[in-house]
Amino acid sequence: MAHNNNNNINNNNNNNNNNNNNNNKNNNSEYKTNRNLLYKTILNDIENSLQSLIKPQELTNLLEDNINKLKELDGVQPTNTFGNLQNTSTNTTTTTTTTTTTTTTSSPNNNVITPNSNLKQTLSPSVLIEHLNLFGNENFEEGDDEEETSSDSDSSSSSSTSSSSSERVPSKKLKPMAKPRPGGCSICKTQETPYWRKGKDGDKTVYLCNACGLQIYKKKKKEKLSKEKHSIKNVLN
């Protein structure tokens, strides 16, 4: 009788151990998923800060929040990780502004007419999607895009002109002002831009000035970042 009782106790212990192991595996999988999402969000925040899409102080707040979430996952008490940086935020902002001013001074985009921020979008969604498919992974501020020739050569040189216009060249090699396009920019209608951004509206080719192209790129970048942050909150909650 005592032997049977011992066997029952051993079986119960084995079942409990198996249940604990399964729970640990499930918890470990969820833990890794949450950590990976937080790491990805942190990297995206840093990347957007480097591209001047978010301000240094905003980056500090975002990093503080996500690092504390990582600590909570590890069972560590959240702390004010960037507390010592709060007093120096003014100096950091000043340095960043100075750098941006220097970059703008040396950029060929000084003569670009900036579109009105309240201007209604006149492009269909397909144009914006096609535009981002063509240029979404590039840094618009460096001007790494198609160079449009402004020479008025005859038809015999049209083939060489077409070839050179599709080559990607550094911004320092771009001409001061690209050849005007019929109808101008599809958004702000300007005829003056260092170079044109090309997209598709159905079968129709449309052109965007550099300023509008940059504006669309930043807008889509912020929307993407907002969606990723929303998904992180849903997982953690």
UniProtKB/Swiss-Prot annotation:
Keyword terms of this UniProt record: Metal-binding, Zinc, Zinc-finger
Region (Disordered): 1-31, 78-119, 140-186
Residue ranges with Low complexity bias: 1-28, 87-118, 152-167
GO function terms (MF aspect): sequence-specific DNA binding; zinc ion binding
Pfam families: GATA
PROSITE patterns referenced in this protein's UniProt entry, alphabetically: GATA_ZN_FINGER_1, GATA_ZN_FINGER_2
InterPro entries, per database record: Znf_GATA, Znf_NHR/GATA
BP terms from Gene Ontology: regulation of DNA-templated transcription
Annotated zinc fingers (GATA-type), start-end: 185-212
Listed Acidic residues bias regions: 140-151
Protein name: GATA zinc finger domain-containing protein 18
Organism name: Dictyostelium discoideum
Gene: gtaR
